[in-house]
């Protein structure tokens, strides 16, 4: 909303394919390309409507680096906000996530897990909105968004269903207006030093190896050699 921010808000959406449905066949060839398509779409939307600044909300895998690539390419005042991770499910007194489902599918195929046990796990493993509950691409790049300086501190840690996200949404709007007023642009923030900091965060958190693809792509948009 516009209350307390002072800017004229306009919202636009960008689609992303689900790579989990693309695994094991030709569809997976489209996964990385979708990142670049997202960056292109955000760029065209911003340029086509002559927007002055952007608060970019992204929630799953390729949409995060795609959004950050667009911010750096456009070099406008930019604040990134993560859509948030899913909450864990509970089964037999333990937290379970989609990662447990991955393992269970293998156990089922090996004949070590019954149909009913697999169905029971699948019903409880993903109980809320949000990105996959593991340090996969989405949560890794969410950590990167803070380390790189595009997201507000602690904003990427709030799970998708938490009401604290309302606060971060408003704060992100206020932050982007402050950046606009002071003419602080994305490339003023995304530097070689911030990229190195982001790489350290990926290593320290046991992040996804896909960051090895996405960090150089973000750097490339800023004209920084980061290989």
Residue ranges and their predicted role:
Residues 3-18:
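Short, small-residue-biased leader/transition segments that mark boundaries at the very start
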Residues 9, 146, 203, 216-221:
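Short glycine/serine- and small hydrophobic-enriched flexible loop segments
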Residues 11, 138-141, 212:
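Short alpha-helical patches at coil-to-helix transitions and adjacent helical residues
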Residues 15, 80-83, 216:
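Short internal beta-strands
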Residues 15, 20-35, 210-213, 220, ...:
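Anionic-ligand anchoring segments at beta-strand to alpha-helix junctions in alpha/beta enzyme folds, i.e.
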Residues 31-197, 202:
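Active-site cavity-forming subdomains of large catalytic enzyme subunits
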Residues 155-167, 213-227:
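Short alpha-helical "patches" and their helix-cap loops
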């Amino acid at each position: 909303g516009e209350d307390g921010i002072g800017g004229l808000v306009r919202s636009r959406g960008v689609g992303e394919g689900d790579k989990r449905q693309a695994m094991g066949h030709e569809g997976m060839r489209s996964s990385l390309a979708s990142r670049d398509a997202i960056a292109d779409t955000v760029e065209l939307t911003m340029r086509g409507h002559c927007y002055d600044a952007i608060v970019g909300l992204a929630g799953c895998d390729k949409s995060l680096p795609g959004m950050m690539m667009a911010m750096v390419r456009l070099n406008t005042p930019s604040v990134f906000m993560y859509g948030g991770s899913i909450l864990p499910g509970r089964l037999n007194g333990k937290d379970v996530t989609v990662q447990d489902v991955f393992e269970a599918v293998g156990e089922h195929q090996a004949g070590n897990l019954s149909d009913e046990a697999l169905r029971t796990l699948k019903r409880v493993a993903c109980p809320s909105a949000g990105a996959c509950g593991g340090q996969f691409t989405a949560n890794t790049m969410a950590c990167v968004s803070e380390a790189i300086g595009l997201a507000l501190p602690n904003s990427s840690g709030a799970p998708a269903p938490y009401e604290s996200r309302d606060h971060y949404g408003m704060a992100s709007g206020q932050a982007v207006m402050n950046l606009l007023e002071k003419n602080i642009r994305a490339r003023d923030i995304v530097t070689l030093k911030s990229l190195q900091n982001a790489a350290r965060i990926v290593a320290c958190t046991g992040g996804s190896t896909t960051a090895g693809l996405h960090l150089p792509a973000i750097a490339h948009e800023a004209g920084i050699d980061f290989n």
